[in-house]
Amino acid sequence: KTDFAILDTHNYGGIKKYHLVTLPLALHGVIAKKDGTVVKVNVGDKPGDPVFGVSDLLIHLSGEQLEKKAAKVIEGENLDLLIGSIPMQTEDEKVKEKVKANIMNLLSKEYGIEEEDFLSAEIEVVPAGEAKDYGFDRSMIMGYGHDDRVCAYPSFEAMLVSENPEITSVCLLVDKEEIGSVGASGMQSRFFENTVAEVMAAAGSYSELALRRALANSKVL
């Protein structure tokens, strides 16, 4: 594997792993550097960007693989992202993984990041390219994540176009739904209830009973 630079990944939520093989992939996310600065990462979507991928066996080498069930054709541990194959041109014998060294050199020049910075990074691997109209009649959308986006975007758009609502309106956008809504920003947390309590306190009308009544009188779409 030292002939290639590979990112070790972990699949997020329930996915059909074989969908991601030999597909152009992009990197989205943020990297928090040791000096505290945050670098935004978005590589693979813009014209001229490189893309990345998960390699697969050639057809004449995949006889055993093709006998497996769909759930086992590509294991989660095999969803490693291929990001480069050119070794660094150096005579330094201390540099053992020359392809990796070359990639890290490129990342240092482009983003000013080091290998240790990946410890505080949150990067997701997604299909490259923008969402597109699907079908001659353009009646559908082809793009990843639209089981959630089809709900999130109309909700946010409705908030933007609403004028003088009779009651307080809230658009609640959360994540981690795919893995059980856990974490500080998932629905199992109390951040929404805490936010309502803070708003009520700022308005001078907070009490535990008033908070419970406000939540009980709310309507959710």
Give the location of each predicted region.
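N-terminal hydrophobic/helix-forming segments and targeting peptides
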Residues: 1-221
